Amino acid sequence: MNITVLHGTLSSEPKHRLLPSGDELITYEVTTELADGAASVPVAWLRPSRPPAVATGDAVVVIGHVRRRFFRAASGAASRTEVVASTVLKPDSRRLARLLNTSAETIQRGVVGPAQIPPAA
């Protein structure tokens, strides 16, 4: 199971690109706080459904999965690990609680199996 939830701050402006396929791609750099400092996490969102209006310094929550891409660079073979977003939200979004609950249920089903999950009250 590969589910990622990030909460952090945009460290640069979102970059919008139109791919040759006609699909839109938005990339973000999200800085997350760690116990021993901070980490910058690249995020890619393909065909965004409802991208939030965000700018450098804004807090965001990203729900998605981790992917490692391999490609050729001038120096030879290279790779990049990034989070592929299914959703990017502002932390105050009303949709956030519902999406986090859905993610938690998906994780629980993957860990304990669907037959063992008690029904929601």
Where are these regions (language model features)?
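Single-stranded nucleic acid-binding surfaces, predominantly the OB-fold ssDNA-binding core
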Residues: 1-121
